[in-house]
UniProtKB/Swiss-Prot annotation:
Gene label: rhaA
Any GO molecular function: manganese ion binding
Record Gene3D superfamilies: Divalent-metal-dependent TIM barrel enzymes
Description of how the protein assembles with itself and partners: Homotetramer.
UniProt name for this protein: L-rhamnose isomerase
Family membership: Belongs to the rhamnose isomerase family.
Principal place of residence: cytoplasm
Substrates-to-products reaction catalysed: L-rhamnopyranose = L-rhamnulose
Pathway assignment: Carbohydrate degradation; L-rhamnose degradation; glycerone phosphate from L-rhamnose: step 1/3
Function per UniProt: Catalyzes the interconversion of L-rhamnose and L-rhamnulose.
EC number(s) recorded for this UniProt protein: 5.3.1.14
Reported cofactor(s): Mn(2+)
Subcellular location: Cytoplasm
Length: 420
């Protein structure tokens, strides 16, 4: 006797088949799309340097929900709990401050050995790893400048940190058999009116060129650079603007990172994908949810998340676009935040794969915009949820909201026992 989920799956499959959509082929494709989940949701971007310093760089994690991870083992345990509730392929995105060492390590001296435990853990869980140098929350970034700093000694420190980070990223790729995407974002900017913008950008350009000068195998490591409109304390001038990094990625052949919260509130990165991909070899996406500013709220299954997925799938860019998440909400259960956001990204990808894109494309090419709009709206109410629940069951993942019960149980038995 079939279950309600199985019955719904068979009905959904037939409904989509009537529109010439192969649901099983869509699920096979979904199984080839990893989403890179960010580790820093689990501890509010604290890391394991244990310096006691504040989070800086014009970013904030607001809230004080109990039970955040404070050790590498706690963070990995929390990640495992989240991964168990998310179907399909996944990656983990690490920042340099998540190193493990018995002794303090200067950021310009970090090495693969400080991330060996992460690599062994990733092997056990069949995960790829991505990486980021951490150019904030440090005494040498306290004045708001790193790679564009006027002081050559400070600038040299951050150049060396990024160079060391690239070698760690390449180590990830070699060990795990999948390239690590390493994204460079720096908080460099000015609170108020800035006279010599060009000098700051010239220094950043020179520093980046020095950082990527060491040849690394792209089968192991991919460079990416990320812009931002502004940050707290850098409202008037950001050195690494969109124009700067688009030009840099296009001229140097790096990937360009588009963060959903790093543009003006009236801009969306879904509209930028098809333009930027004409000029750069790859894109890295930081899917987030900005609420009036780069607030990094948990990703919803909203119009923009869906539009991002549509742009990737419609233009067959899955081999050139790397999907990562970037949010950190300390006001709710952090494991639930991971699960909600990552499942929503995967749901958006599934819905995009189930779209009758070629039919819509022909309508557009023929100028039948009435039918295009009608079909776009009608397909929103097709039974994609039944397909999603079947997909979850195929991966031994709880399909509906019942997953929250497991999170609550983990919270009661594990998170409530933690200090702080």
């Amino acid at each position: 006797m079939s279950t309600p989920i199985e019955t719904a799956w068979q009905l959904a499959k037939a409904r989509y088949a009537s529109l010439n959509i192969d649901v099983e082929a869509a699920l096979e494709q979904l199984d080839q799309i990893p989403v890179s989940m960010h580790c820093w949701q689990g501890d509010d971007v604290a890391g394991f340097e244990n310096t006691g310093g504040p989070l800086t760089g014009g970013i904030q994690a607001t809230g004080n929900y109990p039970g955040k991870a404070s050790t590498p083992d706690e963070l990995r345990a929390d990640l495992e709990q989240a991964f168990a509730l998310i179907p399909g392929p996944k990656r983990l995105n690490l920042h340099a401050i998540y190193l493990e060492s018995a002794q303090p390590v200067a950021r310009n001296e970090i090495a693969p050995e400080h991330f060996r435990t992460w690599v062994e853990w990733a092997k056990r869980h069949q995960l790829g790893l991505d990486f980021n140098p951490t150019c904030f929350s440090h005494p040498l970034s306290a004045d708001g400048f790193t790679l564009s700093h006027p002081d050559e000694k400070v600038r040299r420190f951050w150049i060396e940190h990024c160079q060391a980070s690239r070698r760690i990223s390449a180590y990830f790729g070699r060990e795990l058999g999948t390239p690590s995407v390493m994204n460079i974002w720096v908080p460099d900017g000015m609170k108020d009116l800035t006279i010599d913008r060009l000098a700051f950008r010239q220094r950043l350009l020179s520093a980046l060129d020095e950082i990527i000068a060491e040849p690394l195998d792209q089968a192991h490591h991919i460079d990416a650079v990320e812009s931002k409109l502004f940050g707290i304390g850098a409202e008037s001038f950001t050195v690494g603007s969109n124009e700067f990094y688009l030009g840099y990625a296009a001229s140097r052949g790096t990937a360009l990172c588009l963060d959903a919260g790093h543009f003006h509130p009236t801009e969306v990165i879904s509209d930028k994908i098809s333009s930027a991909i004409l000029y750069v070899p790859r894109l890295l996406l930081h899917v987030s949810r900005p609420v009036r500013w780069d607030s990094d709220h948990v990703v919803l299954l909203d119009d923009e998340t869906q539009a991002i997925a549509h742009e990737i799938v419609r233009h067959k860019l899955l081999n050139r676009v790397h999907i990562g998440l970037d949010f950190f909400d300390a006001s709710i259960n952090r494991i639930a935040a991971w699960v909600i956001g990552t499942r929503n990204m995967k749901k958006a990808l599934l819905r995009a794969l189930l779209e009758p894109t070629e039919t819509l494309r022909k309508l557009e090419q023929n100028g039948d915009y009435t039918a295009r709009l009608a079909l776009l709206e009608e397909q929103k109410s097709l039974p994609w949820q039944a397909v999603w629940e079947h997909y979850c069951q195929c991966h031994d993942v709880i399909p509906g909201s019942e997953w929250l019960q497991q999170v609550r149980q983990y919270e009661e038995t594990i998170l409530t026992q933690r200090q702080g």
